[in-house]
């Protein structure tokens, strides 16, 4: 019973951390997205360093031998997370948060093609509900919704970028069969941060990073902390709960983002709530494996 209580508490913490992460990133919108992504991931990996104190040495060494998966996946993630950070800098957090879950639609396609998973009627229905939910994130009549989606570069960027998030997630599925998930999580964050840092150096965007560290260090640290420890909370949660409970419940972070965006960023979220509900419901149907 104690393990279940701890797991449930960790799950609630994960939902809060995921929801607040987007708010911290939104507050860094004035800086270049590439260098902010670099700082975001490197800071996140820094906050994950304590996990190495509890990882057995033999497990750590085995994980280090298979880091090519993390290198490939983190390189792919750079495209998806750049879209994520860039979209947050240009649009409301309460809009981008549910669109982030569009990666589950891409993941369904990739899982069927490369992992041999069955589609199932519930997953098809979930995909349809998510698709409909996208339109309800925008106000107006159906023709106006189409126009606003087409005109919103940030929305299209996030939907397109979510493909790379799904592709990276597919590689992760193969990788964690042989690599300790904690070592892998740190490696993904660290390598992604290095990739972004390399791009920032090449494009001469580092000055913006120094400016961000000088003026918004607290926000950067909070963003990195929420990024790294949201995953640790997931590991604790699935130690006492089924993954099919922990993963769908994590989608509720969309509503945490919406609440915090309303409270701190003064975003108008009321017209988006129904769309959020539809997208979360559809995403849950995609994630939960129902034997039909």
Model-derived regions: residue spans:
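Membrane-interface interhelical linkers
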Residues: 1-72, 81-91, 139-157, 179, ...
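Hydrophobic/small/kink-forming positions within alpha-helical transmembrane segments
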Residues: 19, 49, 74, 78-79, ...
């Amino acid at each position: 019973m104690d393990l279940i209580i701890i797991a449930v508490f960790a799950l609630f913490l994960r939902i809060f951390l995921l929801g607040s992460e987007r708010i911290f990133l939104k507050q860094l919108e004035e800086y270049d997205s590439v260098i902010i992504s670099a700082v975001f991931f490197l800071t996140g990996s820094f906050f994950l360093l304590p996990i190495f104190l509890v990882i057995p040495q033999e497990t750590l060494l085995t994980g280090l031998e298979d880091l090519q998966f993390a290198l490939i996946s983190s390189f792919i993630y750079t495209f998806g997370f750049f879209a994520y950070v860039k979209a947050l800098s240009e649009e409301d957090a309460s809009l981008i948060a549910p669109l982030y879950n569009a990666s589950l639609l891409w993941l369904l396609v990739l899982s069927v093609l490369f992992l041999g998973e069955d589609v199932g009627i519930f997953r098809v229905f979930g995909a349809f509900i998510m698709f409909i939910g996208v339109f309800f994130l925008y106000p107006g009549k159906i023709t106006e919704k189409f126009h606003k989606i087409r005109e919103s570069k940030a929305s299209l960027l996030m939907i397109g970028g979510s493909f790379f998030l799904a592709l990276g997630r597919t590689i992760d599925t193969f990788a964690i069969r042989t690599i300790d998930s904690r070592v892998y999580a740190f490696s993904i964050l660290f390598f992604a941060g290095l990739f972004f840092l390399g791009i920032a150096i090449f494009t001469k965007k580092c000055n913006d990073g120094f400016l961000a560290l000088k003026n918004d260090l607290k926000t950067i640290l909070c963003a990195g902390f929420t990024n790294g420890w949201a995953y640790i909370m997931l590991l604790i949660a699935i130690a006492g709960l089924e993954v099919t409970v922990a993963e769908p419940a994590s989608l509720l972070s969309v509503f945490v983002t919406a609440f915090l965006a309303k409270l701190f960023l003064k975003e108008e979220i009321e017209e988006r709530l129904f769309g959020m509900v539809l997208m979360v419901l559809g995403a849950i149907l995609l994630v939960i494996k129902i034997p039909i």
